């Protein structure tokens, strides 16, 4: 369970909740420009965009859940169990990249969403695990910059890139379902009901689902993003809080509690990655501008 939101406007911000039954990540990790990226297909990036995000560092490699590069391209990987499919070999003469390589590939290579579309046209996402101990996760990806956002899904029908006018993403089902499902809520607006009464205040948005299923979180996030007068990091944290399950309300298939482990907000204008820990509620910020981005080792 996860939800991501691209909050457009003069102060573009991108963020997500990470909702799991277990923790993830060692905190914000920066990959500097001269950290050598070696992809399983054989491609090597010796110099690239610097980027930051939440990652678990395994054998000296940062396995990112989300991130932002110094050009303002942002990405989040969300669970896509049930529909994610990675072929064993690249399709259509494209180069192959592993699922765990999608984030470093995009953030290292692309300076804009236009670059993202072009880069993805050249690759297939293939079933190559990081290691025997770290298998691939079923994922799809929400990618955005100040100009808009796209969703990338690899299913048995192949890899698809969808324009995402709603600017949000949740989990399974595939994005076309979520997009079409939103049309069922076109009558829900922020306009007053036109009648006086004890129940009139707050009736705007009546019918928007409030549970924590993926379709409901997608609709709720899309509706809030459309109507809320929120901007910047604070506004994004406010929106994400409306779709973040607290501890105890969601039980996973394993019988454990699934809740929001962290919520993050990426601010390209400031090159700031901020994340809020679910346990303490404290917001921790890392500014890329304050670090040496020309290094060769992870920060």
Protein language model regions, located:
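Acidic/His-rich structured neighborhood in mature extracellular/periplasmic domains
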Residues: 92, 96-97, 123-169
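Short, surface-exposed beta-strand-loop junctions and turns on beta-sheet-rich folds
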Residues: 20-22, 81-83, 157-160, 279-283
């Amino acid at each position: 369970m996860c939800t991501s939101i691209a909050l457009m406007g003069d102060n573009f911000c991108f963020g997500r909740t990470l909702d799991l039954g277990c923790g993830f990540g060692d905190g914000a990790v920066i990959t500097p420009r001269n950290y050598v990226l070696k992809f399983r297909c054989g491609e090597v990036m010796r110099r690239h965009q610097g980027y930051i995000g939440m990652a678990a560092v395994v054998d000296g490699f940062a396995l990112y859940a989300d991130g932002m590069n110094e050009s303002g391209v942002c990405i989040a990987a969300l669970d896509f169990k049930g529909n994610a499919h990675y072929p064993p070999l690249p399709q259509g003469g494209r180069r192959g990249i592993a699922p765990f390589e999608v984030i470093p590939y995009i953030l290292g290579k692309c300076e804009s969403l236009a670059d993202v579309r072009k880069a993805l046209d050249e690759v297939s996402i293939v079933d190559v695990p990081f290691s025997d101990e770290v298998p691939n996760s079923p994922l799809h990806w929400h990618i955005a910059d100040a100009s808009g956002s796209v969703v990338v899904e690899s299913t048995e029908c192949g890899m698809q890139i969808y324009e995402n006018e709603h600017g949000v993403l949740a989990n399974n089902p595939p994005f076309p379902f979520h997009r079409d499902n939103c049309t069922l809520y076109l009558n829900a607006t922020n306009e007053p009901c036109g009648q006086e009464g004890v129940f009139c205040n707050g009736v705007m948005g009546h019918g928007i689902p409030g549970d924590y299923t993926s379709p409901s979180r997608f609709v709720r996030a899309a509706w809030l993003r459309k109507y809320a007068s929120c901007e910047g990091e604070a506004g994004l944290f406010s929106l994400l809080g409306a779709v973040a399950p607290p501890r105890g309300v969601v039980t996973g298939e394993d019988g454990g509690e699934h809740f929001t482990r962290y919520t993050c907000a990426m601010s390209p204008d400031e090159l700031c990655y901020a994340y809020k820990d679910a346990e303490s509620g404290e917001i921790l910020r890392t500014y890329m501008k304050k670090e040496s981005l020309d290094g060769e080792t992870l920060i």
